[in-house]
Amino acid sequence: MKKLLKFAPLCALLLAIVAFILLLATHSIEYSNGNLKGWYDGPAALFGKGQSLGAWGGLSVVGEFEGKAAWNAVLAFIFLIIALVALLISSVMVFVKIKALEKFGGLIALVAGGLLLVGGIFLFFTLPAFAAANEWNNTNNFALGGGWVVAAILAILGGVASACPAVLALVEKK
């Protein structure tokens, strides 16, 4: 079991990469009201500019969205990028046979795990922050996109996987 723990940052890195791709490639906010359905793509919530897609019956509409980004989605995106770099460094350092670098790699993985946890939690609150930033009064028919929900879950799981070896090492010492 202990030999497998050194692969935890690598597993967390893979989960973080998938979460990063999902943020950019899937719908961030979805709207549904009877026959009318609409979506905002990932960059719309992250950067305030992107595409809005809609469908009414059989008619499809594509438009440009220019609004304000959700502050927590921007922070989650930044945390995810920092965690990706940190996990890449940590994954390399763990496999280097220098003891001091191995411990430092574990510390970097712990910090990256915390960033992934906070970023994943922030992603769940994108809809209220996006609605407040763009002054929407009613969000009853809006929902967080499925890809973003999966990205948030993967980020949280990656954070737990990344922090697990460091936490277990601390518990083992006591």
Where are these regions (language model features)?
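Signature of small four-pass
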Residues: 5-26, 69-126, 154-172
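Loop-to-transmembrane alpha-helix initiation sites
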Residues: 145-154
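A structural signal for the beta-strand cores of small, secreted beta-rich domains
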Residues: 17-18, 53, 150
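Long, glycine/tryptophan/cysteine-rich extracytoplasmic
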Residues: 23-71, 129-145
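Short, Lys/Arg-rich, polar N-terminal cytosolic tail immediately upstream
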Residues: 1-2
